[in-house]
Amino acid sequence: MCIRDSTNIVIGCVDDKKVLFEERLSTDYSKTELEYAIGFKTVLEIYNINSDDIKGAIISSVVPQLVNIIKAAVEKTVGITPLMVGPGIKTGLNILMDQPRQVGTDMIVDAVATLNGYGAPAIIIDMGTATTISVVDEKENYIGGVILPGIRVSVDSLVSRTAQLPRISLDTPKSVMGKNTIDCMKSGVIYGNASCIDGMLDRIIEANGFGVNGKPEAKVIATGGLAKVIVPHCKHNIHIDAELLLKGLRIIYDKNVEGN
């Protein structure tokens, strides 16, 4: 059982190396551990998974206020104390950062999964509450990253701070140039974020010399709930792996459990 939290709580189950399901529950700071446990158990029941069959659990949390509540909820649901991704846990990743302990757990988990599934060098884009970009060099070192405002965060900020702009859906407009306010906003969100990703990739690739002077080209992997909305409009060749984080959690779990 793998769980990560942020704006949404992502819950999934992995059997051997296969992801059985991935679902999202809304993050609610007012909920008790019992309420979260009921939500987790309901999801398991929907997929006909008996909680007694769960043999292990791991959590990647970027919301400190919820760590203990989510941990207790998992214990109530499956009767297992979950592993927590964080300082002291084995990842197999060499992090060459000024403050390695400050690197977001999701960025680490994504990088671990990418190295295991796609190799190095690699650039990993995770489009969630924040849009993060992680860079792993040809020696499999985690060498840096980028953190941008997430797409929904940007839209919510735009709408809340401007009196005349409405909330919009995130479907693609007919043209890059809108003919009405809603399509203008959609173009800014969809094509603007795609252009941002392309621009950041250009700069990262150039800064690291990927693909020149004998250096291998970097594979570019994208994940997160909104990757499928933005990536099709990017000019770079980007592979979408919606299950990247759950795969990474399973790999890290295996590294930290005796007998694996």
Tell where the protein language model's regions lie, with residue ranges.
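Phosphate-binding/catalytic loop of phosphoryl-transfer enzymes
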Residues: 72, 77-84, 89-161, 191-202, ...
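Conserved small/polar residues in nucleotide/adenosyl-binding loops
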Residues: 1-5
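ATP-binding/phosphotransfer module of carbohydrate and carboxylate kinases, centering on a glycine-rich
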Residues: 27, 154-260
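N-terminal glycine-rich anion-binding loops that anchor highly charged ligand groups
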Residues: 9-17
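Glycine-rich phosphate-binding loop signature in dinucleotide/nucleotide-binding domains
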Residues: 47-52, 117-119, 208-215
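Short glycine-rich phosphate-binding loop at a beta-alpha junction
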Residues: 52-62, 81-83, 213-225
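Residue-level signal for inorganic ion chemistry
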Residues: 11, 59, 128, 158, ...
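N-terminal phosphate-binding loop and adjacent alpha-helix
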Residues: 19-69, 152, 157, 192
